[in-house]
Amino acid sequence: MPPSDPIIVLGAGVIGLTTAVRLLEAHLGANVHILADHWPSDALDAQYASTIAGAHHLSFADDGDARQRRWDMRTFDVLYDEWKAVGERTGLMALTQTEMWEGATSHLAVYEGNPDFRVLDPRTAPCSNITHMVSFTSLTIAPTVYLAALEARVRDLGAKLHRAHVPSLGALRTDPALLALYTRPPAAVFVCAGLGARHLVPAPEAAALFPTRGQVVVVRAPWMRAGFTRQVGSLGGGEGGTRTYIIPRCNGEVVLGGTMEQGDWTPYPRDETVTDILTRALQICPDIAPPYARSWPKDDQVAALRSIVVRDAVGFRPSRAGGARVALASAAGMRVVYNYGHGGAGWQSCWGCAEDAVALWAGGAGGARL
């Protein structure tokens, strides 16, 4: 393909921007255009999950899922190296992560690859009924900071950025308004559009895409510098069961969650869910309460925690039956690389799947699964 042929990346979430970075790094001077409805500096929108996500590196990869484990481990390595190089400047924060389970007596093997991995005595857990507990060093990400840094990187690498709605892949080659952005029909496109991919794929594939609604509460608690998660029930190779999580960020905000509601398109927070999340967060980490309230009765602690709420928000995880799709195909007269359907795993797998997507486009080895 001549360098002057446009290459389109659809989507400007963490999947689209990391894919664009790797594409531009591997092919300097490529004529890359990123088209998206939503951008990192926009107001929060449930359809743009990247800025609402908890955004910590915590793999859900089943022991038998080599592809997901590889993506997640590669992404951790990239993020950890970045944190060691620039610290918290791009929104990364290293911390001790404690994982607790009710009912289970083992952990995902992928955690053993993290620094400082330890199996802990569950009897020392801050809440009752814990049957297994581990800790390790991990990372959290302040999404708007990290996404802004990615946007700056793709600009510096020469990408052109456009706010544009793309109704179909064919429109990229036929719609005059779109063609005016990049002057000639594109020869290749990367579909990194999350749930927006429903409009860019045939009907049978579109039917496999669905939202998994997640509601979170963000509090201002700069004293928190450690992460905690409690899992009740099986992950089921993904995000099954009920999870309660506490995710501190380098800016002093802490994300409390959460919910996993498949097929629920409700974009606004439910107040009863806010109360439930605050109550569960106090169960797994009493120190999330403001210091002055820690000796108070539990209901009063919930009220105190509510007083430091910065916002509550809802995001739609871009889920896909059968898992993420990272594959090369042809459509509308173009080579198409699909990189979507990552559900709640986009942040922890972004660099790994971006590298696979670019390798597929370049004709190298990749993990295509149609």
Swiss-Prot record:
Disruption phenotype: Unable to utilize D-aspartate as a source of nitrogen. GO terms for cellular component: peroxisomal matrix; peroxisome. Its EC number is 1.4.3.1. InterPro entries: DAO, FAD-dep_OxRdtase. Induction: Induced when grown on D-aspartate as sole nitrogen or carbon source. Not induced when grown on L-aspartate, D-glutamate or D-alanine as sole nitrogen source, or poor nitrogen sources such as L-proline or gamma-aminobutyrate (GABA). Optimum pH is 7.5. GO terms for biological process: cellular detoxification; D-amino acid catabolic process; nitrogen utilization. GO terms for molecular function: D-aspartate oxidase activity; D-glutamate oxidase activity; FAD binding. It catalyses: D-aspartate + O2 + H2O = oxaloacetate + H2O2 + NH4(+); D-glutamate + O2 + H2O = H2O2 + 2-oxoglutarate + NH4(+). It is found in: Peroxisome matrix. Inhibited by malonate and D-malate. Very mildly inhibited by benzoate, ethylenediaminetetraacetic acid (EDTA), crotonate and anthranilate. May be very mildly inhibited by meso-tartrate. Keywords: FAD, Flavoprotein, Oxidoreductase, Peroxisome. Changing residue 56 to A/N: Alters substrate specificity; capable of oxidizing D-methionine, D-phenylalanine and D-leucine. Markedly inhibited by anthranilate. Its main location: other. FAD binds at residues 15, 49-50, 54, 166, 317, 346, 348. It comes from the Eukaryota. Changing residue 56 to N: Alters substrate specificity; capable of oxidizing D-glutamine. Its cofactor is FAD. Selectively catalyzes the oxidative deamination of acidic amino acids. Protects the organism from the toxicity of D-amino acids. Enables the organism to utilize D-amino acids as a source of nutrients. Enables the organism to utilize D-aspartate as a source of nitrogen and carbon. Belongs to the DAMOX/DASOX family. PANTHER family: D-AMINO ACID OXIDASE, D-ASPARTATE OXIDASE. This is D-aspartate oxidase. It comes from Vanrija humicola. The lineage of its organism: Eukaryota, Fungi, Dikarya, Basidiomycota, Agaricomycotina. The gene is DDO.
